[in-house]
Amino acid sequence: MKSFYEWYRKHITGAIFVGLILGILTGLFLAGRFNVVLTATSVLGSIYMSALNMMIFPLVFCSIVMGIASIGSAKTTGKITGAAMLFFLCTTAIASFVGLIIPRLICLGKGVSFKMATSDIQATKMDSILDTIKGLIPSNPVSAFAEGNMLQVLVFALIMGFTLIAIGEKGERLLKVIDSCNEACLKIISTVMYFTPIGVFCTIVPVVEANGTKTIVSLATQLIILYVAFCGFAFIVYGGAVSILGKTSPVKFFKAIMPAALNAFGTCSSSATIPLSKSCVEDKLGVPNQISSITIPLGATVNMDAVSILMSFMIMFFANACGVHVSISMMIIILLANVLLSVGTPGIPGGAIASFAALATMAGLPAGVMGVYISINTLCDMGATCVNVIGDMAGCVVLKEKIEIEK
């Protein structure tokens, strides 16, 4: 049994792909003919989605608080941390804007018309900027969690994080409790993720049965456009930053960081690529150890540029496909939330799932989009992690030029 568990854990990505393919085939050829298949997969899919949604709000809250606390505790690193944070947050904002504007300009998802059940969670819909501002502060934090008001949960987490930093040692005990809760939430989510192949199968069957082959075509098109956006962002934004701010040839930069980028693509983990990323920038680009030792690990935690592109892209794609209108004010909320959520997104495979669920809830998308997102998450995650790691190393090159290190 133990050997099977180890084998399954190592090959879970392949199992997810198998579940996706079987789900598509079942939805196309069996679900419409045998009603029991459609009923069974719908029920099991709902159970899987409920298990995931169960921990989304506490995980987002705890992750944001701990992310802010970890940044605050890094004050001893001085100007390097501050400069790195500024670089990462600016590029994340640009990435989120790119992810929102491209699908809107090309109307990605229009005409697909996904048929899905509406979400059980009441989304936070803001009709104007004034309504958004008035709804920022929760009068009752417990109600914000209970009613599924993700925007208020994010703001409450932000306030709590900075408050715990401000009170110093008195807040350490509560931080330890929140850290333990964060680890517990991650453990529960990771346990649920072991059932992802079955969950993907059960959630994709009703979608394919209702929408037919256009589901496959639309998702394939979306993936191609997404990867074009990834490549464009990496070469234009990071290449431009390295050239203009870092005074380094983009060709030299991309050639030097290729081993770390390919490793990130294969492992889907920014954290696991830290040693190789440090080696690339130090040995091939002359980045001082003092800069890389701070910037690379910090980037693995807070630099989620490609994830911001991915999540914004997916939100707009599913909104168009499901007929959900995303107003300008909601786009602004998503952009700001993307920047905030990047602080708490763990640099591990599938770390963006909770963040996507939070944004999907805010945008008022049907609960069923989560199943479709998870089914293609690994394909998206490979490219996203690769771009994130490139961004970490680009930050190192920029900081090498902008910050003087005493020898």
Predicted feature locations:
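Hydrophobic transmembrane alpha-helical segments of multi-pass transport and channel proteins
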Residues: 51, 89-93, 97, 227-232, ...
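Transmembrane helix boundary and interhelical junction motifs in multipass membrane proteins
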Residues: 56-60, 199, 269-277, 291, ...
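Transmembrane alpha-helical segments and their short flanking loops
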Residues: 111, 312-407
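Short amphipathic alpha-helical coupling elements at transmembrane boundaries
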Residues: 39-50, 79, 135, 143, ...
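Signature of multi-pass transmembrane helix bundles
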Residues: 4-7, 13-17, 22-32, 49-52, ...
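Membrane-interface alpha-helices at helix entry/exit sites of multi-pass transporters
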Residues: 76-83, 187-194, 284-299, 328-330, ...
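Membrane-water interface of transmembrane alpha-helices in multipass transporters/channels
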Residues: 36-40, 78, 213-221, 249-258, ...
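Helix-loop-helix junctions within the multi-pass membrane cores of secondary transporters/permeases
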Residues: 259-342, 396-397, 403-407
